[in-house]
Amino acid sequence: ILYSWNYGYNTEIFGGNYNLPSTIGDFFDKAKFAGKRGVYSGAMSNLEIALMADGVASSDVYDVLDSDGGIERALAKMTELCSDDGCFFWSGGTQPPEALVAKEVSMSTAWNGRLFNAIVGEGSPIKMVWDAQILDYQYMVLVDGGPNQAEAMDALAYFTSSEGLAGSAKHISYAPFRKSSLSLIQDPWYEGGPDGNVDIMPH
């Protein structure tokens, strides 16, 4: 599956006539948008968004991280974000939307599918922001020499087929690896939503 790291905010906290958060810079701007932030408990995504919030173009992020002082620059930006009231460090996908709904944080990074489920499936007061999203992916692997090799290969072949990958979009808003799967997602669908008729394609 393909998914992205992005962030969401609680619309009950930032509502009305607010100039609403729309960039990764806004996520780091606590003077403009107050409240505790939720961030992942590891380095993944944090270093990248910190540099982009500090003015580094997305195309240059990994070159900067690979340069002298690049990691230190990113860590300094993260320290600035978390220095006053600290940050909520999450490790599981359900934690960011739960913390947002409970108003334990005003904004949090998250995986897009988890925010989508909370917004569309549960009607949670959350808005997802796509600016500076980081595309990520997960693989399926087969252990060499394990039991039931033939059956495992058949299962793997189906899971990674155009049809199998398209079918996953019925359950979570993560994109298929195969371009050929997109043409199979013909109808608006989302099985977890209240009306079951959500167009998954923009998500």
For the regions a language model picked out, list residue spans one by one.
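A ligand-binding cleft/hinge motif common to bilobed small-molecule-binding domains
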Residues: 108-125
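Solvent-exposed loop/turn segments at secondary-structure junctions
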Residues: 5-7, 13-15, 43-47, 113-116, ...
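Loop/turn elements at helix/coil->beta-strand transitions in domains of secreted/extracellular proteins
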Residues: 33-37, 83-86, 103-106, 123-126, ...
